[in-house]
Amino acid sequence: MSLNGTLKALTDPIRRNILTMLKGKKMIAGDIAEELGISPASLSYHLNLLKKNDLVIESKEKNYVYYELNTTLFDELIMWLKQF
């Protein structure tokens, strides 16, 4: 886990909204973009940054690509923060 990259990814409100939407469920990119009211290109940028920092996991099922939270990373981040 790159703490700097993770924290930087969390600074953007759109990315935080994406993470909130993915809390407890998988979603496809089109549904995320539509719900947020952003372009597919903009969503792709944000999802790539979230994936690069291991905050989101991508999985393929049939003809769809689903995105979901990487809860393991959040557990590690919480444990690290509890040190202080």
List PLM regions with ranges.
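Short, Lys/Arg-enriched N-terminal segment that forms or immediately precedes the first helix
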Residues: 1-7
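Conserved segment of winged-helix/HTH DNA-binding domains
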Residues: 3, 65-84
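Short capping segments at the starts of secondary-structure elements
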Residues: 13, 24-30
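Pre-recognition alpha-helix immediately N-terminal to the DNA-recognition helix
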Residues: 16-20
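Residues within the alpha-helical elements of helix-turn-helix
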Residues: 21, 35
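Helix-turn-helix DNA-binding motif, specifically the short coil turn and the N-cap/start of the second
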Residues: 28, 39-42
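Alpha-helical residues within the helix-turn-helix
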Residues: 34, 45, 51-52
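Beta-hairpin "wing" of winged helix-turn-helix
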Residues: 51-61, 68
